[in-house]
């Protein structure tokens, strides 16, 4: 579970649940193929689409630091109709 860090619960991600789309923060070095394979094997679902983006850097003071720290990457996955991830299911 090094690839996927944790699920994201924001207003946008909750709205996307209605369209069978789930949001996760993942390791910044992971690629889409690794993430897709991990999610399909771990949750036993079929991923039909995936979008990823890097989170913007945090502002603040940086003393003698060149560049900026790489934060995690966020992915939005779309599952086929009928599949769901139990972490997000309503009870």
Curated annotation (Swiss-Prot):
Stored InterPro entries: Nucleotide-bd_a/b_plait_sf, Ribosomal_uL23-like, Ribosomal_uL23/eL15/eS24_sf
Alphabetical keyword list: Chloroplast, Plastid, Ribonucleoprotein, Ribosomal protein, RNA-binding, rRNA-binding
Recorded GO CC terms: chloroplast; ribonucleoprotein complex; ribosome
Cellular localization per UniProt: Plastid, Chloroplast
Molecular function via GO: rRNA binding; structural constituent of ribosome
GO biological process terms on file: translation
Coiled coil location: none
Assembly and interaction partners: Part of the 50S ribosomal subunit.
Function: Binds to 23S rRNA.
Record-stated family: Belongs to the universal ribosomal protein uL23 family.
Protein name per its UniProtKB record: Large ribosomal subunit protein uL23c
Organism of derivation: Pinus thunbergii (Japanese black pine)
Top-level taxonomy: Eukaryota, Viridiplantae, Streptophyta, Embryophyta, Tracheophyta
